[in-house]
């Protein structure tokens, strides 16, 4: 690093994506970098056609899309197209890095981070990896050898990474969740509920819709109506019409149903119990807020990592785990019983809060700052 570069404002590339579980932490890290270094420049590198290409610009950051694709494990013969996409992505990553000249590259997982961090390693640019899950993804495991530090959210990650590189920072969460503190009455009004003694259950089916969770609710809406429990239900866009028709058939049901909840801070505040998939970011938010939770891990994820995330909580009595295969039969009855068991709710809340790591984005930026300062002194 010459004097001209060392005196310039810092530049960072953040690479990865594919799902909200990668994108929301990435944006939180970018926001924390801007708080620490107001003059810094930040460029995202993601995958063409994936969620990050919309979400990142919406958050005020520039993004470059690579033509990268993931492996098709069901149709292996079609993977020659993946190989071509990887070669094209490596070339574009090389061009992007040489033009932007970053001081550091941060990888947040997902196959889009592969070409970017590999090229950064070959050019001698320092890198840091953020692993959200309790079971490390393939891309992060491959990239970890060249990384300076690996920020993790779960203990015992030394079975995947070199212990000397691991820093236990926790997962960054959305600032409105970490720092927003709405009142319960305000939150209930947002969903059309009056202040009452009735318990509230929040069911989150994901952005597209978790079919098993949604069907578990739909099939037993009569029980929800009879219970007097208030229901906040995010169905995802693929299930909303089915859910609305089902709700209309139960006029006594106190239910707010929508495909997407814009104010999750209100939803969490209003809820006495949360039903959710076991994505890393959702779990981090629930830990931070100390929310009693039933986790229904998605079976449609790499390495079954959501089950491993959920087990990290359930084995510590910090959440209830219901396998996807048992949810239709068990979920409604378990939720309606648990939400009225105040002692069990209190115990779950206490245990899940012990796993929280607040201000995770700032902890990650602390590590980035140490690496940047070390590189400056070395050059």
Curated annotation (Swiss-Prot):
The keyword Membrane applies. It is an enzyme of class 2 (transferase). It is found in: Cell inner membrane. Keywords: Cell cycle, Cell division, Cell inner membrane, Cell membrane, Cell shape, Cell wall biogenesis/degradation, Glycosyltransferase, Membrane, Peptidoglycan synthesis, Transferase. Pfam families: Glyco_tran_28_C, Glyco_transf_28. Gene3D superfamilies: Glycogen Phosphorylase B. Coiled coil: none annotated. Its EC number is 2.4.1.227. Pathway: Cell wall biogenesis; peptidoglycan biosynthesis. The keyword Iron does not apply. NCBIfam families: murG. Cell wall formation. Catalyzes the transfer of a GlcNAc subunit on undecaprenyl-pyrophosphoryl-MurNAc-pentapeptide (lipid intermediate I) to form undecaprenyl-pyrophosphoryl-MurNAc-(pentapeptide)GlcNAc (lipid intermediate II). Belongs to the glycosyltransferase 28 family. MurG subfamily. This is UDP-N-acetylglucosamine--N-acetylmuramyl-(pentapeptide) pyrophosphoryl-undecaprenol N-acetylglucosamine transferase.
């Amino acid at each position: 690093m010459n004097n001209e570069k060392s005196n310039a404002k810092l530049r960072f590339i953040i690479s990865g994506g594919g799902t909200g579980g990668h994108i929301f932490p990435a944006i939180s890290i970018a926001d924390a970098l801007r708080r620490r270094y107001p003059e810094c420049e930040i460029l995202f590198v993601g995958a063409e056609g994936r969620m990050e290409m919309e979400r990142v610009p919406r958050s005020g950051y520039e993004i470059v899309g690579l033509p990268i694709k993931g492996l098709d494990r069901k149709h292996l013969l079609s993977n020659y197209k993946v190989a071509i996409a990887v070669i094209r992505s490596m070339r574009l990553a090389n061009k992007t890095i040489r033009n932007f000249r970053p001081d550091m590259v941060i990888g947040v997982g997902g196959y889009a981070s592969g070409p970017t961090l590999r090229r950064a390693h070959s050019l001698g640019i320092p890198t840091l990896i953020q692993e959200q899950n309790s079971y490390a993804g393939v891309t992060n495991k491959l990239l970890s050898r060249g990384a300076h530090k690996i920020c993790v959210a779960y203990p015992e990650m030394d079975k995947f990474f070199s212990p000397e590189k691991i820093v236990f920072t926790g997962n960054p969460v959305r600032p409105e969740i970490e720092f927003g503190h709405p009142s319960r009455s305000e939150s209930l009004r947002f969903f059309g509920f009056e202040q009452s003694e009735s318990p509230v259950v929040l069911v989150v089916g994901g952005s597209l819709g978790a079919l098993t969770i949604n069907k578990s609710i739909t099939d037993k809406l009569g029980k929800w109506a009879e219970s007097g429990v208030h229901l906040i239900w995010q169905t995802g866009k693929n299930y909303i019409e089915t859910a609305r028709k089902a709700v209309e058939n139960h006029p006594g049901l106190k239910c707010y149903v929508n495909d997407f909840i814009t104010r999750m801070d209100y939803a969490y505040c209003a809820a006495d119990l949360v039903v959710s998939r076991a994505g890393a970011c959702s779990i981090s938010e629930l830990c931070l807020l100390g929310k009693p939770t039933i986790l229904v891990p998605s079976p449609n994820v790499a390495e079954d990592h959501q089950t491993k995330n959920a087990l990290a909580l359930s084995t510590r009595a910090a959440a209830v785990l219901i396998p996807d295969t048992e949810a239709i039969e068990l979920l409604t009855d378990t939720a309606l019983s648990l939400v009225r068991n105040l002692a069990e709710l209190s115990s779950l809340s206490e245990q899940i809060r012990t796993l929280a790591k607040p201000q995770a984005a700032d902890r990650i930026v602390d590590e980035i700052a140490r690496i940047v300062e070390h590189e400056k002194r070395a050059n």
